[in-house]
Structures are given as C-alpha cells and as structure tokens.
Amino acid sequence: MIRADLDLLADLPPDPEDRVPAPLATRARAKTSPAKTPEHKTFPPPAAIPAWARAGGRAGQGDPLFFAGAGLALLDAALRADPPAAGALRARLALKSAAASAKILRVNADEAALRDLSFAVGDPLGPAANLLTIWRDCAGRPPSLDPARIGDAAARLDLAVDPSGLAASLKACAGEDDPVSAAAKAATAAFSAVPDARAAEAEILALSVFDTVLAIRLRWPRPVPLIATKLLDPTLQSPGAGRRPSPGDPAWPNAAAGAIAMAAASALDLAADLARRSNTLIAVAPKLRSKPAQKIVDLLLAHDCVSPAEAARHAPMTGRAARRLFDRLLLLGATREFSGRPTFRLYGL
C-alpha cells in the first residue's frame, strides 16, 4: 500500500508553493543535476528486551540492580548504534519526564499540554514551562555537573542552593560504585542540599541529577531521561511501605534501580517503535517533490514533534507549503498528528 501511494505521489506535479525560486544563473543547472543521496538511511529496530528482564524492577522481584544492568546494557547498545531517531527518543522521554515531574509537583500539565506549551508564542512562564525546560536541557546537552547548569535548574525550581558546593559533592558521588548506585547517591546528595519544606522541588532536581550522572558514567553523548518516567509506578513500592521512597530513604537505592530497570525496557520499546516509524519516513522522503523536504525529515527525527510554522522557519518554504508537506507525510503513514485539532497541528514520528 505504501509503495503504491509513493508511486502515485511521484506522478503528482510539484506544489508551486513548495518550490524555492533559484537564481537565474542556476535554474538551468538545477534541472540536470543528479538527486542528492538521502542523508539518512533506514535502520533496524534495537533488540527487544527479554521477558525475564522485563519482569524485573518491581518490588520483591529479585535484585533490581541486576535487572537495571540488563536493561541498560541493551539500551546502551541501541544508542551506540546511533539510530537516526535518537534525538526524537530523547525528546519524547524528556516530555514524559516533565509530565511525571508535574505530577510530583501537583501541576496540572500532561504530555499534551506540555506539547502545546512548547510551541507557545514568546517565552512561556510558570512551573510547567520550567519543568519542560529542565528536562529538555537535560536531554539536549552533553552531560555535565557544571555549577552553572546546576544553578540554572535549581533557579527554575525556585530552590536556593550553593551550586559550586553541590557540584563538588555530586562529582564525588559520581565516581563511586556502579553507574546506577552512583547516580542514586548523587540524587540523594542533591535532594539533601535543599530544606525539607521544598521536598517536591528538590526531588525534581535530584532526578535530573540522577540521569546526568548515569549518562556521565555510561559515557553517553547526551543524557536519556529515564528515572522520572517510571519512578511513580506503584509496583516499585513494597506492600505496606506507606509512601513512595524518596532520595535518602533506606529503600531509595532499590527503588531507583527498579525504576531504571522498568524505564530502560520502556525506552527500548519506544526506540523500536521510533525506528520503524523513522524507516517509513526515510523511505518516503526521496519521493517528495520538495527541496526543503530533507530539512523537515531532519526536524522530525530530532524532535518529539514539529509545527508547520516551525518547519517553515527552518526550511525555505511558506507555512502553507509546510502544511501541505505534512499532509502528504500523514497520508503516506510517515508521520502522526498529535494535537487532534483542525488548526495549530503538531506532527511527529
């Protein structure tokens, strides 16, 4: 079905709005120049996590650190293969982490609301916007325990900390034990640096530190937001425990390891889904009779979602041409629309 749709699309005349006028001296040459080789190639989905490893992580289901290591080993292999949609994977996990953080802070903002917020005009303000920025910064930059980075995250949570002193403590923790245990200790250090009255905000800071230290220890080029996506899972809590473990609690190391075991499995599932979707997008891209199409493909592979207006800013095309291009991709099953609205639509893998 997709091949037939592609052949049909290839026979359609190009949309005049999709064209970018070329200088007179280059127009004739442009007609005869060979097509460029696609920048991205299709990529096999990562190996699925075994059923025995997927069952781990829950309270009372064996050693959570063992299951965390198994999941991280597979996720590490998947990331080191450098899949085309690695950016979209990190961006989507950052969105999930922001939504989970909003629940911890009792902020009314789910994934859909956060997606809309990310495309709001101007500089969005408020707790939800700050949470989204914290996790996007975490996933979008090389992992670092630089005091300035720590201070910026703390400021967005309205926390008064000593960034230099905290950075020194975190670096000391980061070199200890195995990667997951080191990240758990660093999270405890970050959490303990804040007065008890701001425990919820301190936990968000601690979770971002956890993922940063984990990335440093695993030598990932960018952190992959993991722990917040599963920390609220009720199966991590032992029966009769009363409340969810927080950094510094005796049950925290096991809860953190269990959350990572579950998060790594879910991240691998998401990576496999994005690999299949990105392969469809990459296969469709050469058939699109639009010069800026490759830039749109790049945006979709690097982000959770893209608006036509944003696409038009990054590619030499009008907003109407961008909407038409996304409609074509949607028709061919190469992208999805996330908002469900007739206007102000958002597209992604």
Locations of regions flagged by a protein language model:
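Short, cationic-aromatic polyanion-contact patches
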Residues: 282, 286-290, 337-349
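Long, low-complexity, charged/polar intrinsically disordered regions in eukaryotic proteins
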Residues: 215-284
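Basic amphipathic alpha-helical segments that dock to polyanions
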Residues: 300, 311, 322-332
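Short hinge/loop at the helix->beta-strand junction immediately C-terminal to the helix-turn-helix recognition helix
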Residues: 305, 331-334
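Loop-centered beta-sheet repeat module
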Residues: 163-226
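N-terminal structured helix/loop subdomain that forms the ligand-binding/catalytic interface
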Residues: 1-190
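Short acidic, hydrophobic short linear motifs in intrinsically disordered regions
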Residues: 296-297, 302-314
